[in-house]
Structures are given as C-alpha cells and as structure tokens.
C-alpha cells in the first residue's frame, strides 16, 4: 500500500525501506519480487532485465515514487539555491556481509542512473530498528530551461523508481572479491583474441602470421567494454567483403580487455603474439581502424614501440583511422565521473541497442558492482582515458601531427523528441561543455589542447543532424563512405 511522503524531510517507511524527500511530496510504495507480481519487471526494459540476470544482479526491492510534486513548505533546497539540488535519501536494509548492494534509479523519462551506498555508513543509520541500513543520497534532476531549440523541462516529478539490487561478493576459494572484481571477471570472460575475418563476417580463423606479413594488413580494434563482433557489427557484409578482397584476406580483429589493463599492455600482448608467430626479421605493415579506447591501443602500437618487445621483428603502422577516439581523454573517465560513464553506457545500450548489447552491458555492470563495494582500483583500462591521468599525460606530452592519422568524430543531438535521448544529451552537454558524441569530446579526436594530432584534411566531423552517438558510428553512411575513401 502506498504511503505519503513528507515534504518536510522526515523519513517514512515502506516495505522496510526508509525514504526521505525534503522539499518533495508524493507517495511511496515498496514492491518486493514475488511470483505473479510483474511490476518490478516492468520498471526496466527486457534488455536491461536480461543483462541484470546475466550479471547476477537480483532485485531486493523496488520503491515506486509517484505523484511527485514540490512540497508546499518543504525544507529541501531548490534549483538555483545556495545549496545542492533536492535529493532523495533512501535507507535500505543491508543484504548481509556476503552480498553487495547498488541502487538503480529509473526516471519517468526512462533515464537510468546508478547510485552507490554512501561512504559514511554506520549500523542502524537513521533507522528506528536495529538493522544495518545502507544509505543512498540521490540527486533529483530539476526542470531544465529550454536551450533555444524548444526543449521543455525534463525528468522531473511524475514517477520515479528506486530499484535496489544485490549481488554476491564472497568467493569460497578467494575470499572477498570486491577488490578488482571487474578485472577478475574480464580475465575470465573478455580476455585476448586474434582472428582473421572471412569475406562474409567478423568470424574467422586464427591468425597465420606468415600470411599476414606477406602484404599490408588491416587491423580492427574495438573500444571500451566491447568486442570486435559488437563494435563493428554495423559494417555491412559487402563492405567487409570489399575490405577482405582489398587486403588479400589479411584483415584481423583484435579482441582485448578494456577495463582492467591499459592500452600499452594490450599492445604488448599483440606484439608478443606477432613475435612468437612470425619468423625472425619479419615485417608487419598495418592500417588500423580503431573505435573509442581502441585508438589509444593503435597509438601504443605506432608511437610507443620502445615499450614493446618486438624481438627482431618490425611493426609499421602505415595509417590509423580514429573513430570516436578519446585522444585527449574524456571527462567521463575522471575518477569523479566514473559513475557518469557507467550511466551513459547503460542508457546508450538500452535506448539505442545494437547486436550484442546485453554482452557489452554485462561488462558495464561488473564495474558497477565493483564501485558498489567501494573499490575503484584495478580499472587501469578506464583510467587510461582520464584527461588528467598519468597515461594520457605521458602519451600526449609532445603530440605531433601524424600524416598517416585520420579521425572521425561527432556532435550528437537527437533528431526526435524522445525524452530519454533529450535527457542524455542535456546531461552530456553539461558535463563536456563542448561538442561530444555522449562519451568523448569531438575535437579531442584530432587535437590535444588545440595542438593538432590529425591533419585538418583527414578529419570528418559528423554534424548533429545525423544523430550519431558514440556507439553508432559504423552504421552511419557518412562514416562508411569516408572509410572507403581512406582505406584501399
């Protein structure tokens, strides 16, 4: 049964969950998972529900907040005030020492945001019972002013759902697994692989290094959280066939972990396979098409060979096409914004799904689980994209324009009035304060602090009318045309 919220900020209880909404009135009702009650399942899409199941994230309780409105005499701060925006404070029973817990907020416009237990927890925090409670402080998005293009208020009032999820964090053999949880999962499920594609798809045989070094080869390198079969799935079969023929069958996809190890480590593994499989003195000449973080792997192969063990072999990166690559980093990889990175990918994969979206979302959810345990270490692959981090600081210390480099980047703007896409774009624009594809800044694809990395005549800027996001580049006809122009 629904209970009334207290706009004065007092806690109310529903189904064992304490909820305070200072400045906001409305109703709250807990929905526990039970046979025959499908309300909890209806709060997220089938794709997200499947990904949660695959990641072993189980619903502890959903709390529906409905008929929300600004409280008449509420004490919560409002938009533009001296304090922060209004918040929901939820105190949820701990699932126990062997379990982790995280909260997924589902807004009325469908936007999904992850929230983690507050760091200043204590037993019985704010509660009336002796139970251990975990506290969540969830900022509420307030009405957004129009941006000059007729946009109205977004994501405020109406209905929100607090979806509380739990997961196992103890391993019978290894003990507490929260530390480096994502890296351990990635090592088991998303480790390295190399294969030569066929003319009809991205599947293929193991690499024959003798054949690969018989002429120029094309190397496809995927981006963050992804695999080659997902990242390049939008390339039409006839386009893959054309590339296969143009390179004499020497087209290779490079699967690699993107969360737990940095791009140089990825490049080092590739070179180790080359050195082990090719004869002494062999030369490998490659053109690279790299998406997202994969571009940093391509640059490691081209620019950081002093850190690679070529063992008497020679690697020549003849050209590289960067597609949505954070050469100057992305604010989403700043430790303060890792939550925003996970939110962005969760929404992108849900609202604009592609082949393998559930598999990609699984990787995202493993990082969500790790952050929920309070551990941010062991994410070197993500931290390599931090604009102020050590990895990019060293890589971009003396950037020089490279004639063989080319870049494609986009500034996303939704072409529909879909509320969720509008909300995603608004959030990204507030974070980046510059043109972006929701994940990386456009200009950072070809320049570092206004110093060019890619020649001006080898850049493609996709305008916002095409609504290209970070995950949809290869479905764009403009991108496919440009790849044909730049590649043999």
Regions found by a protein language model. Give the residues of each.
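Short coil/turn segments at secondary-structure boundaries
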Residues: 230-234, 264-267, 300-303, 334-335
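Helix-loop module immediately N-terminal to the HCX5R catalytic loop
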Residues: 261-284
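Gly/Ala-rich beta-loop-alpha elbow adjacent to hydrolase catalytic centers
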Residues: 289-294, 298
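Flexible, membrane-associating and regulatory peripheral segments of lipid-active enzymes
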Residues: 1-253, 275-277, 468, 477-488
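Alpha-helix termini
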Residues: 240-244, 277-281, 305-313
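Glycine- and acidic
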Residues: 250-258, 376-377, 465
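Helical cap/lid subdomain of alpha/beta-hydrolase-fold lipid enzymes
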Residues: 149-178, 303-488
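Structural motif
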Residues: 216-217, 285-287, 319
């Amino acid at each position: 049964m629904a209970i009334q919220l207290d706009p004065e900020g007092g806690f109310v209880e529903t189904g064992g969950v304490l909820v305070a909404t200072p400045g906001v009135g409305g109703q709250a009702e807990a929905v526990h998972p039970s046979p025959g009650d499908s309300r909890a399942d209806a709060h997220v899409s089938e794709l997200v529900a499947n990904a949660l199941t695959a990641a072993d994230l189980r619903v502890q309780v959903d709390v529906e907040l409905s008929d929300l409105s600004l409280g008449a005499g509420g004490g919560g701060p409002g938009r533009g005030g001296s304090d922060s925006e209004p918040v929901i404070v939820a105190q949820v029973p701990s699932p126990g020492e062997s379990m982790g817990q995280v909260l997924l907020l589902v807004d009325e416009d469908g936007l999904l945001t992850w929230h983690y237990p507050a760091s200043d927890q204590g037993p019985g925090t704010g509660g009336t019972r002796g139970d251990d409670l975990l506290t969540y402080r969830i900022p509420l998005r307030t009405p957004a002013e129009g941006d000059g293009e007729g946009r109205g208020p977004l994501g405020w009032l109406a209905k929100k759902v607090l979806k509380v999820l739990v997961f196992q964090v103890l391993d019978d053999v290894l003990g507490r697994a929260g530390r480096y949880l994502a890296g351990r999962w990635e090592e088991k499920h998303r480790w390295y692989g190399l294969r030569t594609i066929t003319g009809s798809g991205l599947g293929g045989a193991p690499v024959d290094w003798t054949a690969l070094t018989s002429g120029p080869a094309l190397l496809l390198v995927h981006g963050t959280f992804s695999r080659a079969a997902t990242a390049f799935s939008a390339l039409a079969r006839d386009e893959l066939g054309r590339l296969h023929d143009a390179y004499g069958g020497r087209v290779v996809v490079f699967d690699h972990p993107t969360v737990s190890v940095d791009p140089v480590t990825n490049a080092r593994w590739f070179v180790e396979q080359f050195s082990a499989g090719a004869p002494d003195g062999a030369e490998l000449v490659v053109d690279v098409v790299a998406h997202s973080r994969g571009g940093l792997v391509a640059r490691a192969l081209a620019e950081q060979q002093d850190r690679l063990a070529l063992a008497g072999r020679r690697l020549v990166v003849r050209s590289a096409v960067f597609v949505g690559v954070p050469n100057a980093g992305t604010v989403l990889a700043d430790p303060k914004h890792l939550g925003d990175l996970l939110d962005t990918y969760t929404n992108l994969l849900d609202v604009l799904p592609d082949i393998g979206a559930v598999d990609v979302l699984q990787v995202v959810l493993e990082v969500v689980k790790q952050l929920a345990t309070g551990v941010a270490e062991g994410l070197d692959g993500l931290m390599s994209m931090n604009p102020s981090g050590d990895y990019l600081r060293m890589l971009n210390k003396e950037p020089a324009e490279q004639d063989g480099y080319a870049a494609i980047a986009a500034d996303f703007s939704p072409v529909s009035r879909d509320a969720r896409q509008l909300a995603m774009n608004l959030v990204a624009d507030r974070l980046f304060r510059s043109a972006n594809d929701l994940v990386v800044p456009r200009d950072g694809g070809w320049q570092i602090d206004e110093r060019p990395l890619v020649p001006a005549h080898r850049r493609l800027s996709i305008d916002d009318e095409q609504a290209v996001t970070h995950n949809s580049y290869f479905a764009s006809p403009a991108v496919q045309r440009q790849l044909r122009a730049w590649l043999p």
